[in-house]
Amino acid sequence: MDQQVKQERLQGRLEPEIKEFRQERKTLQLATVDAQGRPNVSYAPFVQNQEGYFVLISHIARHARNLEVNPQVSIMMIEDETEAKQLFARKRLTFDAVASMVERDSELWCQVIAQMGERFGEIIDGLSQLQDFMLFRLQPEQGLFVKGFGQAYQVSGDDLVDFVHLEEGHRKISNG
């Protein structure tokens, strides 16, 4: 079987699984960096559509200020510990992404706030009216979908699965 056929089969099998996994998650973890290069890990509820991932966060929060000065962010959605078969290999989807602020008076703001309202309820009406809350778009670039040990797949921002990562594996330490 040639590489392209393998790639198409892998895409057909994993794309629905990735979409289902993402839809089951309501929050994502954010790894941001401040102007001095200090890392910060946090989380935020999110929605996702063809434009990217979106988080509505307060300027008071450290991660929002970090995104303003350094738009490079890493995001992760991860399987709940109670659902994991193995804690050392929890299912997860991660992306390197670039953040940009969505203007309040834009059509995109209105669309995404409505989408958030459908997903999270009336709290979005209140939060979106607060001056310190900002809507960030997180545009995914390269990512990784990990299903377990030896099951890691490179994923592009538009969920295209790359077969290449399957060739790498764990190796024991040699006692030489």
Swiss-Prot record:
Its EC number is 1.14.99.58. It catalyses: heme b + 3 AH2 + 3 O2 + 2 H(+) = biliverdin IXbeta + CO + Fe(2+) + 3 A + 3 H2O; heme b + 3 AH2 + 3 O2 + 3 H(+) = biliverdin IXdelta + CO + Fe(2+) + 3 A + 3 H2O. Changing residue 27 to V: 2-fold decrease in the amount of liberated Fe(2+). The record marks 132 as: Important for activity. It is an enzyme of class 1 (oxidoreductase). Heme binds at residue 170. Changing residue 132 to L/N: At pH 8.0, slight decrease in heme affinity. Almost complete loss of heme degradation activity. InterPro entries: F420H2_bilvrd_red/Heme_oxyg, HutZ, Pyridox_Oxase_N, Split_barrel_FMN-bd. Disruption phenotype: Mutant is defective in heme utilization. The keyword Cell inner membrane does not apply. Activity is pH-dependent. A proximal hydrogen bond between Asp-132 and the heme axial ligant His-170 is essential for heme degradation activity. Heme-degradation reaction is inhibited by iron chelators. Induction: Negatively regulated by iron. Homodimer. Interacts with HutX, leading to the transfer of the heme from HutX to apo-HutZ. Involved in heme degradation. Catalyzes the degradation of heme to biliverdin, with the release of iron. Forms biliverdin beta and delta. Binds heme with high efficiency. This is Heme oxygenase HutZ. It comes from Vibrio cholerae serotype O1 (strain ATCC 39315 / El Tor Inaba N16961). The lineage of its organism: Bacteria, Pseudomonadati, Pseudomonadota, Gammaproteobacteria, Vibrionales.
